Amino acid sequence: MLSFQILNTDSSSSARVGTLTTTRSVVETPAFMPVGSLGNVRSLEAEDLEKMGYGLMLNNAYHLYLRPGHKVIAELGGLHAFTTWPAAILTDSGGFQVFSLAKFCKVTDDGATFQSHLDGSTHFVSPERAIEIQEALGADIIMAFDQCVALPSTEDHVRDAAKRTLLWARRCLNAHRRPEQALFGIIQGGLNPALRIESARDLVPLGFDGLAIGGLSVGEDKPDMYRILDVTVPELPSSKPRYLMGVGMPEDLVEGVARGIDLFDCVVPSRHGRTGWLFTSTGRVLIKQARYVRDETPVDEACPCPVCTRYSRAYLHHVFTVKEMLGARLNTIHNLWFFAELMRQIRRAIREGSFASFRGRFHEQYRPYESISGGDRDRAEPAESDKYMRGDA
């Protein structure tokens, strides 16, 4: 069973500190969830995430359904036994991946028929099937099956998807058979404020254990994302956890928290780490750049992670450019540690009543492209709005 308690609130914003308690762990919120689509974050072990302080990880039902299969995982004792991850797990229903990764997708009110992005095999997932798969996987928190639309989309398409998501939400609730697994509903509605409000007002009375905002970070500008949060979050009850799906750039974490969000997930820290992007307190470092060949300083002087306290930028540049596997691992460790530390700082500021000053100081210091030069900066721009950011991590 899941319980959620609010411990502190911020007088200058909607930020709050709380605890999300499952049978396996107590998670301090606001919290960021690392994404291990196939059961683990690439290049990391469960112990690595434990050392960083993470108590909740996201696994993806779409990927695990395709391989090794939800029935195989159930036979092996469920995700916790299979992966040896001792803390809480949230599974994304796979709706986003069905509509973004699949080679072919036909959607009706009954469900979605799609072809696997792996081998082209045809599959059908209904709301009931999505719940069945997630219950077999055995996560602590599972998600309703939703229809996520790409942007831009026509107003009619966005409205139809929001209505279908509500229809599917009711069916997911009816299909839910394991009370020890919390079930979250998802709000859709694109960039239409009125539709977002309507979706939230229709979903809240259904009685989900938590509420998620989906369909953002799919190509829209940041002001549009924040505008949708500004109208949607006030419609959600303060007594239940609020989850912003697939959003995870540092500046978005700070702004999401300010608007009352409790949970985030994104592949950004792990995927960017594997491609050589390192997050720091002042911006991002592209470690492949030649400027770091002789740089003896750590990636971030302010970071307490084992990478920054042990290795230089020069060494990280070396292992990355020679394609040593250790390079991707060290980069991922640093990035996920940076995200965990950022969330700790946010929670501390809220508890101490200094979140407003923390927020202002963060935006003064953090520049997403501060350490990126020329064409590399240009190539970085699309990553911010990559519509597959909730994909394979």
Give short role names for the model-derived ranges.
Residues P34, L38, H63-L64, F96-Q97, ...:
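Short, solvent-exposed loop/turn segments at secondary-structure junctions
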Residues L151-P152, R159, G210-L216, M325-A328:
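Glycine- and acidic
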